[in-house]
C-alpha cells in the first residue's frame, strides 16, 4: 500500500458507500481512549517514552493483518509535511491536536480508512471507527472487536472501580466518544437549530462544528456527540445518542417539507443560484463554497437537482479544503490562490459529473 493514497484520494472507501439516513447523517464515529500500563500519560511523559509507545505499536501491529481491514500503515507525524497532516485532518482520520501538538505522535491507518488508531495524542492511543450514515451500533461493535484485538497484545491501564484510565477526567470510565456528523440545512434556515442545540446540551450531549471542538459548522454540518463516559455502559451511551439523532432526523425532514410548502419557488431558486455559483465561479472562498455545497446537497435530497450525485458533494466538501487544494497544487498556496483553484476544481468536477450523467441517460 502506498502512503500517497491517504493524501491524494479525497473520499475514503467508507465515504463512497450509502448508509442508513445518509441524506442527513454523513457518518457515525466511535472513538475509544486507551492508555498503556507502566507509561505516564502523554501530558506528562518524556520524548523517550513517547518514542517507546510508537515503537511498541509499530512492532505489534504494522505487519499483523486485521480481518477485512487488512494491514495497517504507520504514519509518523514527524515525517509528514504540514500539508499532508492537514489533509488527514480534513478527512477526519486524525485530530487537529495530533497534527499540530504531538511531535512524537503517529497514526495507524487501515487501507479502507475505516479504522484509525491515533498514537500519543491526548492518550496513548485513540481507536476510531468510521461508518457511513447512521450506524452507531455497527461502529461500536467494530471498535470493540478491534479494542479486544489490541488488548491481546498490550496491557491497558484499567481500574476496577473507575474503568479505563485516561489523561482527561471527562474520558474516564468507558473512554468512549460516540459521534455523528449531520447535515441540517432546514433546521438552520428555519432557525430551529438555535433552540435545539441548548436542549441537546442539557441532555448531556455536545454539538460542535465539522472538525470538532472549537470549529465552525461550515455548510450546515454539525457533529453531535456524548459528553458522559463514566457510570454508563458503552451500549447505553450509544443508544441514548441514537435516540436523539433519530429525533433530529425527523425534525430536519419536517423542516424540509415545511420549507418546500412555505417557500416553494424561492427555495428552488436558492438551490439553483448556489448551483450556478459553483458551476461558473472563478473565485470562491471555503466558507461560501461550503454554503453553496450545502444548498445543492439539499436540492439533490429534495429532487430539484437530478444531474449531480450526493457522493460528488461529499467529495467536494473535502477536496475544497485548504489542505487538499495545496496537496494537489504540490505546495503552499496563498489564500487568494486557493480561492481560484477551489473555483476551478469545483467547476471541472461538476462538468465531469453532468457529462457522466448525460452519457448514462443516453445509454
Curated annotation (Swiss-Prot):
Residue ranges of the motif RDXXRA motif of the pArg binding pocket involved in allosteric regulation: 338-343
Disulphide bridges: none
Enzymatic class: transferase
Reactions catalysed: L-arginyl-[protein] + ATP = N(omega)-phospho-L-arginyl-[protein] + ADP + H(+)
One MF term in the entry's GO annotations: protein kinase activity
NCBIfam families: PRK01059.1-4, PRK01059.1-5
The keyword Magnesium is annotated on this UniProt entry: no
Activity regulation, short description: Appears to be allosterically activated by the binding of pArg-containing polypeptides to the pArg-binding pocket localized in the C-terminal domain of McsB.
Pfam families (alphabetical): ATP-gua_Ptrans
Subunit structure: Homodimer. Dimerization is important for full catalytic activity.
UniProt lineage: Bacteria, Bacillati, Bacillota, Bacilli, Bacillales
HAMAP family found in the cross-reference section: Prot_Arg_kinase
PANTHER family from the UniProt entry: ARGININE KINASE 1-RELATED, ARGININE OR CREATINE KINASE
Function: Catalyzes the specific phosphorylation of arginine residues in a large number of proteins. Is part of the bacterial stress response system, where it is involved in regulating the global heat shock repressor CtsR; phosphorylates arginine residues in the winged helix-turn-helix domain of CtsR, thereby preventing its binding to DNA and consequently inducing the expression of repressed genes.
EC number(s) reported in the record: 2.7.14.1
Residues covered by the Phosphagen kinase C-terminal domain: 24-255
Outcome after substituting residue 211 to A: Loss of protein kinase activity
Name the record gives this protein: Protein-arginine kinase
One cellular component (GO) term of this entry: extracellular space
Protein's gene: mcsB
Protein's GO biological process: phosphocreatine biosynthetic process
Residue positions binding ATP: 27-31, 92, 126, 177-181, 208-213
Amino acid at each position: 500500500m502506498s502512503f500517497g493514497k491517504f493524501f491524494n484520494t479525497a473520499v475514503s472507501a467508507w465515504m463512497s458507500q450509502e448508509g442508513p439516513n445518509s441524506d442527513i447523517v454523513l457518518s457515525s464515529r466511535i472513538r475509544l481512549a486507551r492508555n498503556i500500563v507502566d507509561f505516564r500519560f502523554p501530558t506528562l511523559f518524556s520524548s523517550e517514552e513517547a518514542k517507546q509507545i510508537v515503537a511498541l505499536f509499530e512492532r505489534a501491529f504494522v505487519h499483523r493483518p486485521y480481518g477485512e481491514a487488512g494491514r495497517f500503515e504507520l504514519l509518523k507525524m514527524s515525517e509528514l509535511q504540514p500539508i499532508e497532516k492537514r489533509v488527514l485532518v480534513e478527512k477526519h482520520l486524525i485530530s487537529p491536536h495530533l497534527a499540530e501538538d504531538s511531535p512524537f505522535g503517529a497514526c495507524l491507518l487501515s487501507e479502507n480508512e475505516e479504522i484509525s488508531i491515533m498514537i500519543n495524542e491526548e492518550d496513548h492511543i485513540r481507536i476510531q471507527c468510521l461508518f457511513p450514515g447512521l450506524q452507531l451500533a455497527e461502529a461500536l461493535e467494530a471498535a470493540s472487536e478491534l479494542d479486544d484485538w489490541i488488548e491481546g497484545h498490550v496491557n491497558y491501564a484499567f481500574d476496577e472501580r473507575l474503568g479505563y484510565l485516561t489523561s482527561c477526567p471527562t474520558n474516564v470510565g468507558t473512554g468512549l466518544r460516540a459521534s455523528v456528523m449531520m447535515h441540517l440545512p432546514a433546521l438552520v434556515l428555519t432557525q430551529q437549530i438555535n433552540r435545539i442545540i441548548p436542549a441537546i446540551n442539557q441532555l448531556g450531549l455536545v454539538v460542535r462544528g465539522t472538525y470538532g471542538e472549537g470549529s465552525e459548522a461550515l455548510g450546515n454540518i454539525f457533529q453531535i456527540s456524548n459528553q458522559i463516559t463514566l457510570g454508563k455502559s458503552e451500549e447505553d451511551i450509544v443508544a441514548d445518542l441514537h435516540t436523539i439523532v433519530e429525533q433530529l432526523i425527523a425534525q430536519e425532514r419536517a423542516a424540509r417539507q415545511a420549507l418546500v410548502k412555505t417557500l416553494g419557488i424561492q427555495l428552488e431558486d436558492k438551490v439553483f443560484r448556489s448551483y450556478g455559483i459553483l458551476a461558473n465561479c472563478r473565485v470562491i472562498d471555503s466558507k461560501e463554497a461550503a454554503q453553496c455545497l450545502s444548498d445543492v446537497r439539499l436540492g439533490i435530497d429534495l429532487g430539484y437537482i437530478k444531474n449531480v450525485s450526493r457522493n460528488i458533494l461529499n467529495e467536494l466538501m473535502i477536496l475544497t479544503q485548504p489542505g487538499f487544494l495545496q496537496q494537489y497544487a504540490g505546495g503552499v498556496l496563498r489564500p487568494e490562490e486557493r480561492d481560484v483553484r477551489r473555483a476551478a476544481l469545483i467547476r471541472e468536477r461538476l462538468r465531469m459529473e453532468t457529462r457522466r450523467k448525460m452519457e448514462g441517460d443516453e445509454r
